[in-house]
């Protein structure tokens, strides 16, 4: 399991999501969390991600184009929460969202 860690700000979280997606390890093999990391787990590789505005902008554009503005609003609100697992929640929501497209929030 690879755990991607980042600062608890929007650009860092979006960059972390970009790196996890780009790693091609698969959703079962990655987890994302904000720092500071509490208890380290055995058999996990921890990878700190520095914020990158271009990567964050790429994720933002993809969300708005492929899923929609309402999805972007939910991602933003989740990123602003104080939960350490917010990046992981957003990552898994986006996996679902990119699969279903603009119909993700319908029903």
Q: What spans do the regions from the language model cover?
A:
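Charged, alpha-helical interface segments at or near domain boundaries
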Residues: 41-107
């Amino acid at each position: 399991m690879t755990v991607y860690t980042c600062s608890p700000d929007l650009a860092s979280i979006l960059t972390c999501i970009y790196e996890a997606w780009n790693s091609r390890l698969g959703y079962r093999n990655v987890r994302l969390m904000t720092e500071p990391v509490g208890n380290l787990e055995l058999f996990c590789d921890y990878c700190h991600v520095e914020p990158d505005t271009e990567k964050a902008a790429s994720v933002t554009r993809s969300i708005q184009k492929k899923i929609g503005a309402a999805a972007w609003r939910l991602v933003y609100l989740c990123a602003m929460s104080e939960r350490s697992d917010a990046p992981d929640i957003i990552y898994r929501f986006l996996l679902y969202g990119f699969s279903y497209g603009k119909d993700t929030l319908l029903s």
